[in-house]
């Protein structure tokens, strides 16, 4: 069986295993006050040298989103997100469970636009205090569809948020894939476009872990209180920080993502050449082909993948590559795709 189901099905890169083996029962201060965490923060800050940022480490993406959004919103405030957003579709109502409404807008290939944000604010102005007050915007990069924001799109969205008095947060669980897709911007540029954003490790070679980067100084003071209240403050926080050192010290973070993107592009090209329709044209490590029922029934016997959407006469599935994907696996998948294509 080939595994293209997700990008977190293998434990971690060798550098992280080596880092853990070097701990040797040493003693570290708890809750992110240790020397390893400070070192990890300094490494990440060096990637955003034009900005004064605060960094906190949590164990995963959903808890990062919960913590960031809870820290931003009053009880009567909500957050804008597109209909395909991770907090809308794949976090089991975790934001709503905190008492905050997600104001859902249509997406443009998985992306929120400045115009969509303006429309929400215009609609709110009709009823004022009879509606949830829009206070923040949530985006992800790469998006749930594997698409990416251009730097111009990020700046346009950030400028619109500033104009309207909204916070902008970016979910970066697949930020490595976005940065290595050829967009031409860096972590330093991302820091200029958001009030908060995350750098995901779990989907790019770490065992687990997410870095929350707070760029807006007004949002830092009580953030760790919200972390603790949300169950996000780990006693052994250095276990996350150590992984980010291993990811960034010698650029494994970028190498992992580049490799995954390149393999996904090979798969996408094979699909295109074989005549499979694609949901979107992707540039990252996720590929979304449409399969007939016969093609789906054949492929599922040999390949592990996710069903993304079911239509009347075809099924949209998702193939995901990762740091652990091999050329042999990609070649074998291409052979199965050739066989399935003949089934029509």
What spans do the regions from the language model cover?
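General beta-strand structural signal in soluble alpha/beta enzymes
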Residues: 3-6, 55-59, 81-82, 139, ...
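Active-site phosphate-binding strand-loop segment of PLP-dependent enzymes
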Residues: 4, 112-172
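PLP-dependent aminotransferase-like
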Residues: 63, 73-133
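Conserved C-terminal alpha-helix-loop-beta "cap" of PLP-dependent enzymes
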Residues: 74-76, 265-267, 271-342
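Active-site C-terminal subdomain of aminotransferase-like
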Residues: 134, 143, 148, 186-284
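Active-site pre-lysine segment of PLP-dependent enzymes
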Residues: 150-159, 163, 174-196
